[in-house]
Amino acid sequence: MNTIVKHTVGFIASIVLTILAVFVTLYTSMALNAKITIIFGFAFIQAAVQLLMFMHLTESKDGNLQTFKVLFAIIITLITVIGTYWVMQGGHSSHL
């Protein structure tokens, strides 16, 4: 696939997924848990689109290096998310 076409498809897919997430949040009467589940689904799909279309994940000859980079990014993301949640919960419980 041509680079310009690939970037255009990725950009449009990202915009569509973002608009769908906003629509689900603002204009549906689903339960909160259902909304969160759907938004997380859109987020994971959008992360895959970003990795495949913009980060050139499939264009390397050395698959081991790409795998290491993706695993490292996942670990850093999990540390950031879990650490943020932990700090927020600790701050919230100390103010009650």
Swiss-Prot record:
Q: Which GO terms describe its cellular component?
A: cytochrome o ubiquinol oxidase complex; plasma membrane
Q: Which InterPro entries match?
A: Cyt_c_oxidase_su4_prok (IPR005171), Cytochrome_c_oxidase_bac_sub4 (IPR050968), QoxD (IPR014250)
User: What GO biological process terms are annotated to this protein in UniProt?
Assistant: aerobic electron transport chain; ATP synthesis coupled electron transport; electron transport coupled proton transport
Instruction: Give the subcellular location.
Output: Cell membrane
Which of the seven top EC classes does this enzyme belong to? oxidoreductase
Membrane-crossing ranges are 8-28, 36-56, 68-88
Instruction: Give the catalysed reaction(s), semicolon-separated.
Output: 2 a quinol + O2 = 2 a quinone + 2 H2O
Q: Name one GO molecular function term.
A: cytochrome bo3 ubiquinol oxidase activity
* Keywords, sorted A to Z: Cell membrane, Membrane, Oxidoreductase, Transmembrane, Transmembrane helix
EC number(s) stated in the UniProt entry for this protein: 1.10.3.-
What is its membrane topology? Multi-pass membrane protein
Short name of one Pfam family for this protein?
COX4_pro
Protein family: Belongs to the cytochrome c oxidase bacterial subunit 4 family.
Q: What does this protein do?
A: Catalyzes quinol oxidation with the concomitant reduction of oxygen to water.
Q: What is this protein called?
A: Probable quinol oxidase subunit 4
Which source organism?
Answer: Staphylococcus saprophyticus subsp. saprophyticus (strain ATCC 15305 / DSM 20229 / NCIMB 8711 / NCTC 7292 / S-41)
